[in-house]
Amino acid sequence: DAHNEDEEHAEGS
């Protein structure tokens, strides 16, 4: 469920 602002673009985290 990557619909949280933190996970939607968390690729290089």
UniProtKB/Swiss-Prot annotation:
Keywords from the UniProt entry: Capsid protein, Clathrin-mediated endocytosis of virus by host, Host-virus interaction, Viral attachment to host cell, Viral penetration into host cytoplasm, Viral penetration via permeabilization of host membrane, Virion, Virus endocytosis by host, Virus entry into host cell
Top-rank taxon: Viruses
Signal peptide (UniProt feature, chain positions): none
Any one Gene Ontology BP term: symbiont entry into host cell via permeabilization of host membrane
Subcellular locations according to the entry: Virion
Cellular component per GO, a single term: viral capsid
Role of this protein: Capsid protein self-assembles to form an icosahedral capsid with a T=1 symmetry, about 22 nm in diameter, and consisting of 60 copies of size variants of the capsid proteins, which differ in the N-terminushe capsid encapsulates the genomic ssDNA. Capsid proteins are responsible for the attachment to host cell receptors. This attachment induces virion internalization predominantly through clathrin-dependent endocytosis.
Protein name: Capsid protein VP1/VP2
Source organism phylogeny: Viruses, Monodnaviria, Shotokuvirae, Cossaviricota, Quintoviricetes
